[in-house]
């Protein structure tokens, strides 16, 4: 990201005038899954999962020209910021289905350590432990299809926040339970048309970043500050969906409304919100503000919010030659407002998606055009994002290796129109556009 705000400081003008941010990611993950089938009348099977993940993201300053010639002092001034996340997860699902009911009980445990460190402690090491119990039920009640689920989470999150001025450390512990449930009823209206109505209530506690973050996040261009006093979110969602399929013609329409109490969002702070008490403006604080003056101050805050939107799709399948061709049109849109009437930030605009696909034996060709509309229904402090069209294509061939396995080869092209496109939901949409025209190939082998 280019930053020109330091040009007024003669001693920093040369150093920061052409500053850019570079990042690298290193992740190691090991996953083991299995299933044990039983002949018991009560317990049909047990699925089990173990996953261990080590993740590291390094964000560093670098000069566009001559960045290798800086002295040691300058190198220390721009020491990298390192995001780490080490997680271990265990899970098991017990199938206790009967002839009339599908029933499953799930247990899951996660132990996660996170930290964001650099020249200063941007987020001190934090620990997150979660134990989950879940129950799922599915039944055919003749007149309706019923799906229902319940989930209980026991969560403990511990962390600390270091005062940027005086270095004092405050320790925090969040220990709470959340309860969530969902239920849906489906009904066949005709042989080709069915309807589904669903309701879900989901509780979510703030993450360790939302609670304890306290420093610069270069990839978002923000000086982020969490809040250890954030409350949990409660989301109540109602949706209704219609599906039609007569073998050739198909259509889908889904509508939803989602009320979220205590919705947590990262909100940019503007000049009229950035006043600080003079008695705390010591030399260290001034240096801290000057060092990160090119970043936008942003706080994790919460307020009640409402999301409402829809998704539709229509299409038809034709026989063509020795294969089938499918054409379709889809559209989705969402509106989101806080309880005070202001728009929720970084909400993507409406999209129209045109698709064409052709399948013949082991060949698949797909062409899609995504028409993303202009987003001018924006939140406070946001800027309008222009519309764009994204044309993608891919051709896939599957080779059967004489019983030894299956080789899948895909040739693809994305953004074939080479549009200068920007994602409205991105914190750095102006500095980092979506990738331009590119081509590639993918290979996968299953045995």
Which role does the model predict for each range below?
Residues 25-188, 194-196, 200, 252-255, ...:
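Face-selective signature of the C-terminal outer-membrane beta-barrel domain
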């Amino acid at each position: 990201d280019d930053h020109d705000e330091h040009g007024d400081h003669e001693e920093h003008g040369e150093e920061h005038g052409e500053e850019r941010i570079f990042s690298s990611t290193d992740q190691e993950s090991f996953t083991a899954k299995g299933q044990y089938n039983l002949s018991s009348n009560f317990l049909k099977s047990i699925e089990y999962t173990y996953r261990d993940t080590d993740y590291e993201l390094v964000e560093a300053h670098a000069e566009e020209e001559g960045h290798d010639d800086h002295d040691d002092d300058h190198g220390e001034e721009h020491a990298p910021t390192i995001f780490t996340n080490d997680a271990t997860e265990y899970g098991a699902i017990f199938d206790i289905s009967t002839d009339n009911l599908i029933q499953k009980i799930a247990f899951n445990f996660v132990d996660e350590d996170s930290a964001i460190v650099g020249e200063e402690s941007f987020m001190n090491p934090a620990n997150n432990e979660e134990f989950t119990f879940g129950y799922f039920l599915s039944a055919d009640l003749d007149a309706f299809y019923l799906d229902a689920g319940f989930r209980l989470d026991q969560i403990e999150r511990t962390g600390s926040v270091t005062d940027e001025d005086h270095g004092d450390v405050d320790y925090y512990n969040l220990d709470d339970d959340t309860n969530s449930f969902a239920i849906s009823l489906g009904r066949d209206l005709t042989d080709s048309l069915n309807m589904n109505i669903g309701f879900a209530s989901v509780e979510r506690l703030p993450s360790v970043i939302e609670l304890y973050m306290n420093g610069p996040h270069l990839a978002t261009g923000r000086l982020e500050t969490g809040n250890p006093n954030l409350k949990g979110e409660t989301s109540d969602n109602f949706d209704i969906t219609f599906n039609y399929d007569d073998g050739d013609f198909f259509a889908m329409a889904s509508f939803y409304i989602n009320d979220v109490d205590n919705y947590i969002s990262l909100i940019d702070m503007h000049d009229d919100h950035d006043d600080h008490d003079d008695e705390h403006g010591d030399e260290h604080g001034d240096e801290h503000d000057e060092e990160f003056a090119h970043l936008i101050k942003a706080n994790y805050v919460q307020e009640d919010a409402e999301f409402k939107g829809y998704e539709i799709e229509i299409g038809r399948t034709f026989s063509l030659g020795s294969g089938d061709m499918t054409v379709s049109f889809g559209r989705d849109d969402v509106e989101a407002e806080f309880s005070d009437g202001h728009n929720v930030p970084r909400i993507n605009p409406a999209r129209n998606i045109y698709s064409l696909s052709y399948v013949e034996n082991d060949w698949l060709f797909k062409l899609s055009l995504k028409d993303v509309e202009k987003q001018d229904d924006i939140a406070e402090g946001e800027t309008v994002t222009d519309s764009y069209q994204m044309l993608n294509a891919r051709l896939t061939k599957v080779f059967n290796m004489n019983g030894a396995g299956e080789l899948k080869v895909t040739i693809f092209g994305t953004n074939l129109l080479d549009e200068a496109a920007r994602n409205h939901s991105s914190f750095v949409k102006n500095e980092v556009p979506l990738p331009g025209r590119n081509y590639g190939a993918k290979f996968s082998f299953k045995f």
